[in-house]
Amino acid sequence: NIKVEKKAGGSVSDSQIVNGIVLDKEVAHSGMPKKIENAKIALISAPLEIEKTEFEAKINISDPNQIKSFMDEEDKILRDMVEKIKSANANVVLCQKGIDDIVQHYLAKADILTVRRIKESDMSKLAKATGGRIVGNVNDLSEKDLGLAQNVEEKQIENDNWVFVEGCKNPKAVTVLIRGGSQRVIDEAERSIHDALMVVKDVVERPLMLVGGGAPEAYVAVKLR
């Protein structure tokens, strides 16, 4: 439940622990807000788009008006997805799959910060950090499924934009963001942090330890003499 992200640049002293999850993703649409305070987060594992059928389908159109009707119906389906998100009072959407351009447009108009194509492992950590529930169908989304965070913000890390989900209350998952002057430095820092975390894990699971530096041998020698 500890996510480790690393980015070359700055110094090791710039490394930090985030009480939440850092995503190496940017906001999906340029018209969306880059920061949301008091975030109410919808975690959606399904695509926010019209799913393709498993079999090839053809539509016979005999009247130009039918094209408009077809496109209007498609637009309505996509718009209804956004309305469902709005009705749940979400102001942030974190989606594991793709999001249709039309859905992105309506989400931007509603000032809902959105991130797409998030890794499944990150979705699981987001649920643990925010207390939200991952929903497999947007139509099943309700306010009780939403996760909470003090703020969700897109920040520039060197030449990339990453999204920080921060200020989660009693998070069950957190992020360690490692910085350093070179890739070699941050790789070494990551190994050191991993070793330290494994030591803590072992001590918590089995509160036993053996001191080093020859102390056990010296103690035995004293007793034998």
Task: Write out the residue ranges for each language-model feature.
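Core, soluble structural subunits of large cytosolic macromolecular machines
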Residues: N1-R225
